Structure formats: C-alpha cells, structure tokens
C-alpha cells in the first residue's frame, strides 16, 4: 500500500514540523489536534509555534492543498502519534494522551494501515498502544497477535531533533525504526524515506523506546555534572566558565555548559521514565535528575543574596528594588516554555520579592498564565535601564549581542556566562 494519506496526531513542536515535512514531498497530510486554535491557524497557512523555516513550509503546503488540519481523525494509510507524555506527581509516566490518541484513530483503521508512536514513552508503550487498538478493533489483526501477518503494522520511531533546528535535523538526522515485527519496521522505514535523508536504523520497538530514553538521560547526566561544578566553583571562588574552557582543552574532555537547571519536554522528563521502571538500578540517572532539579533553588538563593547586598549598599527599601529576569524559554532562541527552569525561577522570585519583577523574553508576546499578575513583560532596553538586579537565565542571541562591558549593574546573577 502506498502512503497517499498520512495523519499526524498532535500538532505541537514535533507533530507540526513532521506533518510539514511529509506535505513538502507532495503527500496528502492531515494534522489532527484537539486545540481548535491550532487547527484554525494551520488551515490559514500560519503556525502557532516558533520554529525557524517552519512557517514557509506550512504556508506553501496549505496553499498547494497538501496539508490540512482537523480535530477529528480521518481514514489514512499511516498514522503518526506525537502527543505529550508528561509524568505524574510521583514521577510516574502519564500515558493518557497516547491512550486517547490511539483510541481516537482506532475507528478509522483499515487493513494495511501503519501506526507509529513518536512520543517519548516508557519501554513497552508501543505494545500497550497495540493492545488498546486491538481491543477496539477485534475485526483487525495486530502484530502481538499474528506477527508479520498482521492487518495493521505498528512501530515506535522517536525523533531526535534540536528545537530551533527542527526542520533541518528532522530531514538530515538518522532515525531509529522500532517495529513490532520486521514487516512493521520495513513499512515504517518506507514511510520515513519519503522525506528522510538520514539513515533508517532498524531495531525492535522496546529497544527503540529505550534508545530515546537513553539519549536524553545521557545528556541529563552530563548537564548535571556541569551544574554541580557550577555550585562547587561558586563556593570556591572560581569562575566556572573559565574552568570548563580550560578543562575542555584536554583532548578527551568535553564538559557541557551549566545553566539554571534543565527544561523542555524531553531531558527534564524522560530520565524519570527509566527511574520509574528501574528504581533500584537507575541510581546515577536519579541523582542527575535531582541535581538538575535542585539548580533553580540554588539560583533563587543567589538572587536573594544579591538583593540583600544591594539593599545594604543603597538607601532603597525592598519594595523599591526592580529585579529583571532575562529569558523564560527552556533553551535559547525558541518560544517553548515547557518544563522551563527559567520560568519557575521567575515565578518564585516574583512571589518572594515585594518590588517589581520584570521578565524579558523576545520570543513571546504575552506572559504565560503562570506569570500573569506576578511579573511585567519588559523590553531588553527597558530592563537594562531600570532594573537594580539582573538575572540571566537563557542565552538568547538578543542577550548575547549586548556587550557585558555595557551592562553596568553591580548585581548580576548570570547562570549562562553571558555578561559575567
């Protein structure tokens, strides 16, 4: 069966670029999302997220009739599920969105269809998804029932893209293809080669699921090392940025850069999936998560110390002091605030501080609900001109373009080494 109609369930930071990539190859793509605003925006040929080069691809695809969006799934040859997989209060994976997406497409499945889970998920999630589908469609056979003879093929194929470079990496990067059977893997590989220039590397679904979790946990552990170094260096009176620069001159050392914590829907979340399934074995992974989760508290303590110094050196009351936080996104040059330590830090500062708290985030036009009423959204120039204490949280290009020599405030907490 050729892939004449492809459905992408979930039109967020991964789903929409994926839909656009298929549509750019002149395939009919139907994007499905429960967000009516997102659906209407896409059908106008516009986008509701910030991602370089995405807007032009979506605009062209919609105008040419290859891409449309809806809130209701339609019969398709292939379905890609790219919905959130957050964790619950106790760090257990929450698969409710995947379950809902799977059950929404089940009535539209036909013989020969391919269903791919892209959402980062615990090991065994693809098999669970296939069970949900089978329970709703007893008239069709699935890989866990009849193997390669299944009517519906099922696979797990995680993305590995960098926000801000998604439209390039989606096409260029290798893709792990984890089918529930060799036939499932072959069909999934056939689908991705429609736009993929990288290699399709075939394995089984459980290994593919663990591969995605491993990649993000590896990065989390390495970031934790850098963040822990920043705490140690602060106590020792050592410039952590200089230290890392010197250490990285060793030919076999490559320390990452510290920051205010770890955010985003991947690195800050996925390691907990391993910990939840392997609590006794995943001790290093758990510790890395705890180190990175603690970093925002450390930053806030540094802010409080700088505010105290500022008050001691001036005649101002705390209510007369202005604190400016630079950046809310979880990484530079994007608008994605998911699991952002910067936003959590800004919110806690605003709740604690009796004076004004400004935030500067060049990639958004309005404050998120979490900060509404707590902070004011300021321009870069206004914040630099009016704030007494500066808190650098995200190294956006706009901030790096400002020379540190021109920043005259004495009280700066720079978690990214931009101005200090």
Where are these regions (language model features)?
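Structural/interface elements that position substrates and couple domains in central-metabolism enzymes
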Residues: 1-420
């Amino acid at each position: 069966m050729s892939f004449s109609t492809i459905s992408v369930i979930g039109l967020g930071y991964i789903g929409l670029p994926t839909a656009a990539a298929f549509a750019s190859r002149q395939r009919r793509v139907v994007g499905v999302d429960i967000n009516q605003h997102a659906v209407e925006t896409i059908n106008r040929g516009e986008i509701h997220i910030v991602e370089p080069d995405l807007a032009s691809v979506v605009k062209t695809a919609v105008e040419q009739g290859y891409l449309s969006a809806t809130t209701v799934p339609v019969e398709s040859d292939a379905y890609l599920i790219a919905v959130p997989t957050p964790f619950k209060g106790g760090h257990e994976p929450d698969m409710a969105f995947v379950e809902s997406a799977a059950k929404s497409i089940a009535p539209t499945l036909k013989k020969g269809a391919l269903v791919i889970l892209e959402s980062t998920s615990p090991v065994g999630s693809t098999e669970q998804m296939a069970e949900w589908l089978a329970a709703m469609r007893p008239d069709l056979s699935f890989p866990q029932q009849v193997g390669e003879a299944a009517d519906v093929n099922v696979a797990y194929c995680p993305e590995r893209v960098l926000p801000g470079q998604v439209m390039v990496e989606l096409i260029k990067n290798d893709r792990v293809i984890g089918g529930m059977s060799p036939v499932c893997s072959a069909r999934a590989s056939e689908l991705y080669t429609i736009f993929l220039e990288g290699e399709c590397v075939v394995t089984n679904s459980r290994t593919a699921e663990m591969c995605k979790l491993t990649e993000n946990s590896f990065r989390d552990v390495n970031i934790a090392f850098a963040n822990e170094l920043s705490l140690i260096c602060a106590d020792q009176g050592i410039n952590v940025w200089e230290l890392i620069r010197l250490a990285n001159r060793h030919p076999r050392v490559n320390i990452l850069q510290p920051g205010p914590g770890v955010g985003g829907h991947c690195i800050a979340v996925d390691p907990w999936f391993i910990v939840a399934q392997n609590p006794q074995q995943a001790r290093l992974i758990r510790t890395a998560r705890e180190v990175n989760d603690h970093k925002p508290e450390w930053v806030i303590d540094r802010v409080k110390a700088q505010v105290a110094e500022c008050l001691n050196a001036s005649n101002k009351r705390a209510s007369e002091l202005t604190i400016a936080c630079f950046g809310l996104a979880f990484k530079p040059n994007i608008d994605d605030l998911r699991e952002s330590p910067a936003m959590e830090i800004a919110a806690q500062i605003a709740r604690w501080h009796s004076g004004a708290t400004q935030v500067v985030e060049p990639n958004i036009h309005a404050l998120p609900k979490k900060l509404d009423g707590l902070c004011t959204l300021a321009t870069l120039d206004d914040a630099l001109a009016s704030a007494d204490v500066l808190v650098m949280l995200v190294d956006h290009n706009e901030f790096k373009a400002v020379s540190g020599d021109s920043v005259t405030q004495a009280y700066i907490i720079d978690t990214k080494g931009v101005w200090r």
